[in-house]
């Protein structure tokens, strides 16, 4: 009655805070993946854990098949990035958690074995913040004058906002999450889809980290899956330069819409 639903890659962080998450974890040897899932199941069973939870591990990428990984922590809840697991497995984790709390078994939920992950899913966290060249994060605030999230096949936006909304600075800076799913096992294709979705997200009235996220998604290190938890902090200057280019591009589209072409101007959506 214990089941590992899947795994995620959460290495892209700034100041130890996740900003981009991926499912499934890429370049993870199947033997290591199964060992990690087995460790999570063993731990959950040993403490009599009931409900859904998140078990985090750190993998030594230099171990080369030696399965060196360490347990970090267990969270007795779903994480912000549960969305990418939902997209690649087709399992509604929130609904499943509620049904388990109401007494349903995994068998009743037809969760008899670990679901096969289909393709890649990527989540980008839209935060009300800007990032300086030294990696310093500065929170932003203001009244939203435009809040128009992306949509279309394989594109999901979880968030809250509207024109006239003034987000409180007393809470987390997270404004929205953009989640994309590509059914093909092509990581670069999924990354491009996420970057394109972010480019379609129109937020005006306050600054966000969207340009920075787009810069990351276009980075060669990210696309070749070399990012580690310290990668963003160590490469902040070059990533900032990329994000500044994206900022100028966004402003140019807003100020000169006709020069950007009819699609950018009319902001077409597929439903």
What kind of feature is each model-predicted range?
Residues 59-71, 217-228:
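Short glycine/threonine-rich loop-to-helix capping motif typified by GTGT followed
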Residues 1-9, 31, 35, 58-69, ...:
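Phosphate-binding site of ATP-dependent enzymes
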């Amino acid at each position: 009655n214990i089941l590992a639903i899947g795994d995620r890659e959460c290495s892209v962080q700034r100041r130890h805070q996740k900003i981009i998450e991926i499912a499934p974890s890429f370049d993870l040897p199947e033997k290591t993946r199964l060992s990690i899932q087995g460790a999570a199941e063993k731990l959950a069973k040993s403490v009599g854990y009931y409900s859904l939870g998140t078990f985090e591990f750190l993998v030594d990428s230099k171990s080369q098949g030696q399965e060196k990984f360490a347990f970090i922590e267990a969270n007795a809840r779903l994480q912000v990035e549960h969305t990418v697991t939902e997209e690649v497995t087709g399992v509604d984790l929130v609904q499943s958690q509620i049904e388990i709390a109401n007494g349903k078994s995994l068998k009743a939920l037809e969760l008899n074995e670990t679901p096969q992950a289909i393709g890649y899913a990527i989540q980008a966290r839209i935060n009300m913040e800007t990032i300086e060249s030294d990696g310093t994060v500065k929170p932003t605030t203001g009244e939203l004058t435009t809040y128009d999230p992306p949509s279309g096949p394989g594109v999901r936006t979880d968030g809250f906002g509207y024109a006239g909304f003034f987000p409180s600075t007393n809470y987390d800076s997270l404004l929205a999450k953009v989640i994309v799913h590509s059914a093909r096992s092509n990581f670069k294709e999924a990354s491009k889809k996420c970057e394109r979705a972010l480019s379609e997200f129109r937020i005006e009235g306050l600054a966000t980290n969207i340009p920075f996220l787009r810069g990351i998604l276009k980075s060669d290190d990210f696309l070749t899956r070399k990012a580690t938890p310290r990668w963003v902090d160590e490469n902040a200057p070059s990533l900032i330069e990329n994000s500044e280019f994206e900022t100028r591009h966004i402003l140019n589209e807003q100020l000169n819409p006709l020069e950007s072409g009819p699609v950018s101007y009319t902001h077409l959506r597929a439903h």
